[in-house]
Amino acid sequence: MLELNFSLVKNYLRLSADISLKSERIYAVVGPSGAGKSTFLNILSGFTEISNGSIVWNKREISGLPPSKRNISILFQDNNLFPHLTVWRNLALAVTQRPKISNDDRSQLRSAMSEVGILGLENRKPSQLSGGQQSRAALARVLLQKNTILLLDEPFAALGPSLKDQMLELIKKIAKNRKLLVLMVTHDPADAKKIASHTIVVKENTVHVPIDTKEALEPTKGPLADYLGNN
């Protein structure tokens, strides 16, 4: 269980939350542009400090911990792959800072690459990969961190419909197999409906209590009716 009870008041940033999120569930995070969706993920991951309140994961307070200690991984839209490194070296950064990779590390790397479907591409650099392959490589690196909370900040927005659907299905499969809690920011209601049973609406400086995705994205009377009606 991830329990959030916090407020953020810093310069132009305003955001508050009082919600609980169940483990082993995928949540979509939706709302108008500028509502605070990415800020919400940055707060959870530790890149933005809250003004007051708490963030509790499985009865452990984590709001005072650095990002590396929170059991949370985040995947961004730009993938953050180092262009001068091969896929193998990009992924290795998730498990070791040593130049020499141990046999155990090699096994972990191969397992992650197999899980996301890029085994055999380890010697390529990011520029030699398709957009879908880059997304899979970035996902593999995140999975190697072995955290149980996965945050997705529109990582597949630049992909075409077919590739994006493949990545969403892959996320669903991995989340189930690894028993992950997933929060995915998206501007596309169709993506939310495909992957998430529940949706968190971020609106008017508030992270609202999760509700059924179909209810949240009802275009005529849901909480985002005005927003969805203009898209």
Q: Which role does the model predict for each range below?
A:
Residues 61-78, 97, 220:
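ABC ATPase NBD coupling module
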Residues 103-121, 172-173:
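Conserved ABC ATPase "signature" region
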